Amino acid sequence: MTRSIFIHTLLALSALTSVHGANSPGCGKNPTLANGVHQINGREYTLKIPDDYDANNPYHLIFGLHWRGGNMDNVVSGDSIQPWYGLESRAQGSAIFIAPNGLNAGWANTNGEDVAFIDAIMEQVESDLCVDQSSRFATGFSWGGGMSYSLACSRAKEFRAVSVLSGGVISGCDGGNDPIAYLGIHGINDPVLPFDGGVELAERFVGNNGCQPASIEKPQSGSNGWKRTDFYGCSKPVSFIAYDGGHDGAPLGVQSSLAPDATWEFFMAA
């Protein structure tokens, strides 16, 4: 093998590792970031690091995105939802959590500015903390769900999976042709972002992931129940949960484990 070919081979392998998962540059370093609010490019996000953080252990990285009219504090405190969408308690110290603050209490993502914000947060956090770069996730409700969907469209190679709660195409979909593990959760009587729209979001990734088409199962209205549809033949998993409810950050109620359990288990299996 010539020196030129050898060097090009090493560069190709390095690029492959960066796309498909390596430990972040922050692994092995003494961190300078701490729990709390941080700023980057004039915007804010809240960071939650496990109490027993180990700089030599790569962690999952999970973004929790707030809804319209909300903010990062609502995600952290659990205002109308379980804190961190119920995922921090299920992670049991295995994940670093980030709650970014949207502009004007939302995620319009004008000219991709919110995706760029997420990119900048990842770069800042991963340069300082130890992250498994193949294990990044995003979830959110309503506009936060729309932003999670937007990340699925434009950052499918950077994120492993998303969970979209009552989302819509309200933060754009730049790209939208790559496969990514996708979980949709939507109320059948949603008066804000209609149920059929939520189904259409999932169907994009049914196609991208090469899944076998299937009809979405729905519970009876008034049943207080839910139905899950898992698609088969997919290169990356796609599932959809239809529940008897409206536009809810906590499907079937704040005390319900439906969305937190489904999201956590989906992320870990993706």
Curated annotation (Swiss-Prot):
Give the location in the cell: Secreted
GO BP field: xylan catabolic process
The reactions it catalyses are: feruloyl-polysaccharide + H2O = ferulate + polysaccharide
* EC number(s) from the headed UniProt entry: 3.1.1.73
Q: Which residues form a coiled coil?
A: none
UniProt cross-references to Gene3D superfamilies, sorted A to Z = alpha/beta hydrolase (3.40.50.1820)
The protein's UniProt keywords, in alphabetical order, are: Carbohydrate metabolism, Hydrolase, Polysaccharide degradation, Secreted, Serine esterase, Signal, Xylan degradation
First-listed, main subcellular location of the protein, grouped into a coarse class: secreted
One GO term describing the cellular component: extracellular region
Q: Name one GO molecular function term.
A: feruloyl esterase activity
For this UniProt entry, which residues form the secretion signal?
1-21
Which protein family is named in the record? Belongs to the faeC family.
* Role this protein plays: Involved in degradation of plant cell walls. Hydrolyzes the feruloyl-arabinose ester bond in arabinoxylans, and the feruloyl-galactose ester bond in pectin. Active against paranitrophenyl-acetate, methyl ferulate and wheat arabinoxylan.
- By what name is this protein known? Probable feruloyl esterase C
